[in-house]
Design a protein with these regions (language model features):
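Conserved P-loop
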Residues: 1-71, 127-130
Length: 139
């Protein structure tokens, strides 16, 4: 299942995502992974959370990003949750191909029983209808 924290840039999506990670660490039985566009939040995350700076992996388009996520999932059978901060940037995704990418990520998450929680810099009204039930928070 995918879950989305949406809102315009600067509305506090990252804080909500980090708070969610902090709570999840206390209850998690498996692995947690946090993907971001930098290492900026390294010291805000528990050492039980794997921080991945996506800019270090030469991802140049959304198809490569989906493959990257597939690789993460395939290498950790205990993976519970993947957190994606600044989703549009780290996934190299635009509004034009957003639906395709979200559907692929949703299919992956359901097939391998991994929750994917992401922050998306878009208003709730801009998001596609098929994700309306996947919105965790709208700012």
């Amino acid at each position: 299942m995918i879950q989305i924290i949406c809102g315009e840039k600067g509305k506090g999506k990252t804080k909500i995502l980090l708070d969610h990670v902090s709570k999840a660490v206390k209850e998690a039985n498996g692995s947690l992974v946090y993907l971001d566009k930098s290492n900026q939040h390294m010291f805000e995350l528990s050492n039980r959370v794997r921080l991945i700076n996506c800019t270090e992996y030469m991802i140049s388009n959304s198809s490569e990003f989906v493959g990257f996520i597939s690789g993460i999932i395939s290498q950790d059978h205990d993976l519970e949750t993947i957190y994606l901060d600044s989703f549009l940037k780290v996934a190299k995704t635009t509004k034009d191909n957003l639906e395709v990418v979200l559907r692929k990520l949703n299919d992956l998450s359901e097939a391998f029983h991994v929750t994917i929680i992401m922050s998306v810099s878009m208003d709730r009204e801009e998001l596609l209808e098929f994700v309306s039930d996947k919105i965790l928070a709208a700012l």
